[in-house]
Amino acid sequence: IKIKEDTLTQQWKATGELNRKARMLKTELFATGKKKISLPYINRRFGAEVTFDTLYYSMTEENLANNQLRLNGKARVSGLDIFHKALSPEVIHLDRGQLTYQMNIGNHTLELDSTTTVLFNKIQFHPYLRAEKKEAQWHFTAAIDKSWFPADDLFGSLPKGLFSNLEGIKTRGELAYHFLLDIDFAQLDSLRFESELKEKDFRIMEYGATPLSKMSEEFTYTAYENGMPVRSFPIGPSWEHFTPLDSISPLLRMSVMQSEDGAFFYHKGFLPDAIREALIYDLQVKRFARGGSTITMQLVKNVFLNRNKNFARKLEEALIVWLIETERLTSKERMYEVYLNIAEWGPLVYGIREASAYYFNKRPSQLTTEESIFLASIIPKPKHFRNSFAENGQLKKNMEGYYKLIAGRLAQKGLISEIEADTIRPDIQVTGDAL
């Protein structure tokens, strides 16, 4: 097969067999002269580049009872390189990938059997997928159960270019993984989500490209907007606006925590129930409206992954969160201190010290209950803080429910009395430069 695109000319060779009687197909594709195949036209159409050494595919079709169809086969690729800016800023490389599959197809069902095997560099697992249509509504199930295996099989199999912070990391010990996602679109509230990566004698022997414990000491944080750096400052005593955790009002600390992640000091980086609730809500409104992120996840996203907003970032984020929390690379107290010192509280307003001055001309230790609850409320959308105010400069009435909720939690935690909580209203005076 001769392929010509602009100035690039390729000579491909395809071998294989098609046997209609045996209902079997197998084929292999490679370039002559030990060169890589470069898929044509996708660069011009999608801005992507895909090259590989060899591609192999086979399929056998088998008719079963009740109009059931079974497909068995194998797909294999070697020397795969992929580049697209939506995936990674670098070329993604996969030495070898292989799928040995059994697929069952019915009138209203499609199932990837659990005997299916995925080989991904050094790691192997058996996924299960099922899609069933019932009365115009779909029911999807996906599951993976991977029993104990060497930890370095996972971290040594991560494709180069896709997990830049983890490239070169060396580990020891064993891991086991369980995943389940079950979505019945006729009953979204019944959605099930389970994800657990367990460890046995796990240790990081050598960091990869990034020292994952860097938050434990003073480090330079860079804030980005639209992929461009806008400010850099050290998170430690050398920054004049840095505020130690014990110099921040307990009311502010608890208000933010109860608003963003009330179980922060008790979980290990993930809250599956929060992710489940976010998935249900997103599916109900048919858009990405909630993320279910913990404070650890937000920190990792901002400190380690800020520049790489792409499809693979969530996977890398999850792995880094798991490593930091499992290995206790940074204490919870220090993580929360970092969080409050890098949080954006307005246009180019970073950290609680700048926020306290910007809104109330105060130091973080002087914030009142009402001021603390207000600052907690704007963390999700700091650039739109003015939407919280009416034309007369007072907080809008629709803030009352939020104030009541957080005040109640402050009372439960013993920071204010029940009587004080009942008197809390969305009433603040902005004396800084914000308005």
Provide a role label for each language-model segment.
Residues K2-L435:
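Juxtamembrane regions of bacterial inner-membrane/periplasmic proteins
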